[in-house]
A protein has these predicted regions:
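Surface-exposed ligand-recognition segments of extracellular binding domains, strongest
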Residues: 1
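Surface-exposed loop and adjacent secondary-structure segments within mature catalytic domains
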Residues: 153, 157-162
Length: 335
């Protein structure tokens, strides 16, 4: 295998990938690095990357501000620490609106399963979760308090991704969003700020949802399964932060986030690598993201089309079709 200037020399699963210069490459005189080695990092030892960087074994390394060794690393590398600018990749929390698998769950009865499903199909309930989510506290588990705002995104499609008629995409969305209800009028969609978190609004939206759901026979608290890679401390910390902010805002008597600690392989198999929606074994998942293929908002939206989107199972827990009842319930065929 080769990619032009380099030939694959070796590939060892969960260890390393090595490439060497391709002497038959047409422009080989401009390939100045003869050998490239990519090392696998499983996220467990948060001091490993900084140590390797200090030993000149890595040309760059990620630091973990919440790790136990960060204070010493900050002193040692203070003149070399930078924050990576936000790009067009967006990472979100997916909502499984049509869950079928319950191998990894805290739910004990079919009644609990149905109550959670009905809750996630309720717009006011989903909005309550969104307003209860402290994105800054969540981001701080990865970037530290000082760097948390640098990775916050409040829109799935970046607000400055495109412009039209002198307005950014975010400004155009905000104009429409304000017409959906008073709860949205004070929100801010710009990157780099905690523009959706509002515990008061979360409580108000939840109160509306609870009234409607109790009329449907839903029992509280709603138990929400959220899987995480148990071997990666920063990922566990983020999910714990999400749990804390949601339960504090809405009350444990109303909503409980049940963290499902899984191996990396099990997590991948019930999220991204699940062969179909029947294998998507979760209620909410932060193992979801997308990078654009071209400069148009449709590159983000087409993958979520209810009838044909390639990623409806990963983001929303259902296989694309013309007649999914859950997708109908939340209005996905209306767009």
């Amino acid at each position: 295998l080769y990619n032009g200037p380099y030939i694959l020399k070796s590939f060892t699963s969960k260890s390393s990938i090595e490439m060497t210069k391709n002497e038959n490459y047409w422009d080989k005189d401009k390939v100045y690095v003869s050998d490239v080695k990519l090392e696998f990092y499983d996220g467990q030892d948060q001091s490993k990357l900084a140590k390797s960087f200090g030993e000149n074994a890595l040309s760059l390394a990620k630091l973990f501000p919440t790790g136990s060794g960060y204070s010493e690393q900050a002193k040692e590398f203070k003149d070399e620490i930078t924050y990576t600018p936000q790009d067009a990749a967006s990472y979100v929390i997916g909502t499984n609106i049509d869950r079928q698998s319950y191998k990894h769950t805290a739910k004990k009865t079919d009644e609990e399963k149905q109550s959670t499903k009905k809750a996630l199909l309720n717009k006011d309930f989903r909005q309550a979760i969104s307003f209860a989510f402290n994105r800054e506290a969540y981001a701080a588990q990865l970037n530290g308090k000082d760097g948390a705002s640098k990775i916050i995104r409040n829109l799935y499609i970046p607000p400055t991704f495109v412009q039209a008629d002198g307005k950014t995409f975010g400004e155009m969305v905000k104009t429409q969003l304000d017409t959906y209800g008073d709860e949205w009028k004070s929100t801010k969609l710009d990157d780099g700020q905690n523009g959706l978190f509002d515990a008061k609004k979360a409580k108000e939206e939840f109160a509306k949802a609870k009234t409607a759901l109790e009329a449907e026979g839903v029992k509280f608290p709603i138990h929400i399964d959220m899987p995480v890679d148990q071997t990666t401390p920063s990922r566990v910390q983020r999910v714990q932060s999400f749990k804390q902010s949601v339960e504090e805002a809405l009350g444990k008597e109303n909503v409980v986030i049940d963290i499902q600690m899984l191996s990396k392989e099990d997590l991948q198999n019930v999220t991204l690598f699940a062969p179909n929606a029947a294998g998507e074994d979760w209620d909410l998942s932060d193992n979801v993201g997308w990078s654009p293929d071209y400069q148009d908002p449709s590159t983000y939206m087409d993958i979520l089309k209810a009838s044909s989107g390639e990623n409806t199972k990963t983001f929303l827990g259902f296989d694309p079709s013309e007649n999914n009842e859950a997708a109908k319930k939340v209005g996905l065929y209306d767009f």
